[in-house]
Amino acid sequence: MDDLNEAVNATNSTFTQSAVTYMEATSTNLDTFTAHNGKIIFFHGESDPVFSMYDTVSYYENLSSRDGSNTGTFARLFLIPGMNHCSGGSYALDSFDPLGAIVSWVEAGTAPDSMIARNSFNPTANPLNPTPNPLSGSALPSGRSRPLCPYPQYAQYTGTGSSEDAANFTCVAPNPDDELAPKVKTIFHRQ
């Protein structure tokens, strides 16, 4: 790890700033972005071994602290259960369409209240990706789907219908009186 740390932080006469300089996005001032009607969807795999999802949650919470209830008009965060860095994970439901969601938000003004995620281990589950990562969702039943809910909401089974079908789940906000809310229940709630 020390060698990796040294390499990532390296500089020289040509490259006077390290790559880390650009990785630490801490400014929550998105005023210029929002002034141009910018919209952003953050998503992060809960099993990401490279970057902690807690850093992304922290950034989003800081953004929400700065912009208050206005945050949801331009930014949404979705945590993806079981997903590694950008995709994959044997328990991942990593087949979803954030591009379609952002296009709909920008062009039609429809903010994503949820996105449907599927087990991409089943090649027919995602027509946009006919050759899925062979390990993605391999430990899950074929065809499983769930709604991805905007943070801090989480998907809760309605109690009727198949627990493998996203249609039988609803996005709910954590109860603020619940001592596990919002982070732990939001992040680790599983059906």
Segments the model singles out, each with a brief description of its role:
Residues M1-Q191:
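C-terminal His-loop and adjacent cap/lid subdomain of alpha/beta-hydrolase
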